Amino acid sequence: DLILAEDTRTSSVLLRHYDIDNELRSHHKFNEHQTAQSVIKRLQSGETVALISDAGTPGISDPGFLLVRECVRNGIEVQTLPGATAFVPALVSSGLPCDKFCFEGFLPQKKGRQTRLQTLQDESRTIIFYESPHRLLKTLQQFSEVFGEKRQVSVCREISKIHEESVRGTLAEVVEHFTQTEPRGEIVIVLAGTDNGEKPVKEKNVSKNKYKKDNIE
């Protein structure tokens, strides 16, 4: 009955491709507190509501948690479809241990950022972050200061897209790479934990996706 989208302009392209013309409304981080209760009322009246993201999976560094929590509190069934999540392929292709890991998502932009990093200094599991391209270099430089420039890291961008690319090496090497090469696209940083921080994955390398992915115009 209702489709909630992070950005209706983006989602409408996909929906039009499949001739889906159900009611479409925006549901994002700036309005989810206001819209959650009205959505709950529609669900309680017997309607069916779908929540989709621009990319990735709702709730994973995307809107969705608040609405799901309200559904659970109100005894409303939530069905989740397996979807794309950037950090999983980034982790698998990093060459770093993926049997144990922690997902940190986006770091605070200002307040609490340094404190958050300091709490992770002794983390032995592989650590995964999301970052925007214009903050990537500064973030990697901060990582070098906090974790040491010899710590192994893999930076993946544009996962599942035509220009998919992974840059692997020590923090010092990857900082040097992105000092010379402007980062673009959506970024996933996979950082080695303390147990394997000094063990090289490989010499610094850049791998690119050989296969073009399906595009919907």
Go through the PLM ranges and name each one.
Residues 1-79:
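Class I S-adenosyl-L-methionine
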Residues 9-11, 56-57, 86, 135, ...:
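Alpha-helix capping/helix-boundary segments
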Residues 47-48, 126, 130-217:
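A contiguous loop/helix-start segment that scaffolds small-molecule binding in enzyme catalytic cores
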Residues 37, 62, 90-92, 114-118, ...:
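Short, well-ordered secondary-structure micro-motifs
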Residues 66-123:
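Class I SAM-dependent methyltransferase SAM-binding "motif I" and its flanking Rossmann-like core
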Residues 8-9, 26-33, 84, 104-109, ...:
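Short, acidic/turn-prone active-site loops that include or flank metal/cofactor-
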Residues 1-23, 87-88, 92-102, 111, ...:
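RNA substrate-binding interface of SAM-dependent RNA methyltransferases
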Residues 21-29, 78-79, 99-105, 150-156:
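Short hydrophobic/aromatic-enriched beta-strand-loop microsegments
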